[in-house]
């Protein structure tokens, strides 16, 4: 999903692909770490494990927590800190995208991200409205922790 959203965001607003991926990443991790109501079309596992995989990554890079949820939040914060240390924008707005233009194009942007070939590889099958919400969160503010996208 992150890659799908970055494809469309970068193409629409001329944001370099790596930067678009970085800005969206904290929100997609938060989204994917929540138990889905629907898996992807062809999941590679029978039970939801994305949150546990994120927790393993957090432990591997030295920011694991006492619970899976705490580990996921620590991972998201570590991604955000890295963006700050590298002096990268931490929101779509900081990438120079005009707010009115962004929200005028948001519905079509989310629909195109939903249709992107990479979306089917995501551990959660997103609704277009969920993609819009992730984009909206990523537009306005740096990641604040414990945000959820339903």
Name each model-derived stretch:
Residues 1, 6-21, 115-121:
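Glycine-rich phosphate/pyrophosphate-binding beta-alpha loops
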């Amino acid at each position: 999903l992150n890659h799908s959203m970055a494809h469309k965001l970068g193409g629409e607003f001329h944001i370099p692909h790596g930067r678009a991926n970085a800005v969206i990443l904290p929100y997609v991790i938060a989204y994917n770490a929540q138990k889905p109501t629907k898996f992807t079309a062809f999941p590679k596992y029978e039970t939801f494990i994305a949150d546990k995989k994120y927790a393993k990554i957090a432990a591997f890079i030295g920011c694991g927590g006492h619970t899976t949820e705490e580990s996921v939040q620590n991972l998201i914060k570590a991604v955000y800190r890295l963006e700050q240390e590298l002096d990268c924008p931490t929101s779509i707005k900081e990438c120079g995208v005009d707010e009115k233009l962004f929200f005028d194009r948001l519905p079509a942007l989310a629909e195109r991200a939903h249709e992107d070939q990479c979306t089917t590889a995501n551990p959660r099958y997103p609704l277009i409205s969920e993609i819009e919400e992730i984009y909206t969160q990523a537009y306005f503010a740096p990641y604040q922790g414990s945000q959820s996208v339903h």
